[in-house]
Design a protein with these regions (language model features):
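Rossmann-like NAD(P)(H) cofactor-binding subdomain of soluble oxidoreductases
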Residues: 86-136
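Conserved N-terminal Rossmann-fold NAD(P) cofactor-binding segment
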Residues: 2, 25, 31-77, 83-91, ...
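Gly/Ala-rich phosphate-binding loop of Rossmann-like dinucleotide-binding domains
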Residues: 16, 20-21
Length: 136
């Protein structure tokens, strides 16, 4: 299965590496070119015991890119694991999630499964489903 994980923080990076270790073709997508360069070199920008070793063992199934079109075009499943920081009023900032959805829609000619792993408030997945339904 071709899996893209949008966001290579603690949630996204670990997920992408584990998917690759299980034999799936996994792409880790991030807007941070420096982080992508580090990951392509086999180094992790965060501390997670055993992660770099698992990255090395899974390197034949694991790729990192900042090019969202490339990352999304052949994905069977896309995991969105981007930040949802708290706004001043305490609500979640969902612009990164919605930006990922915009890029997915722009890059896809056929459907795929989109899984939101980011922490989002109730109703967000309904909003995302309606968004994709409207553009289909």
């Amino acid at each position: 299965m071709n899996i893209t994980v949008c966001g290579t923080g603690y949630v996204g990076l670990v997920a992408a590496v584990v998917f690759a270790s299980k034999g799936h073709r996994a792409i880790g997508l991030d807007i941070d070119e420096c982080k992508i360069s580090l990951l392509r070199g086999g180094a992790s920008p965060l501390f997670e015991p055993g992660l770099e070793e698992l990255m090395a063992k899974s390197s034949c199934n694991l790729e990192f890119t900042a090019d969202y079109r490339k990352a999304y075009e052949s994905a069977d499943v896309i995991f969105v694991a981007v930040p949802t920081p708290e706004k001043a009023d305490g609500s979640a900032e969902l612009s990164y999630v919605m930006q990922a959805c915009d890029q997915i829609a722009e890059s896809r000619e056929r459907g795929c499964i989109v899984v939101v792993k980011s922490t989002v408030p109730p109703g967000t997945n309904d909003r995302i489903q309606a968004y994709f339904d409207d553009i289909a």
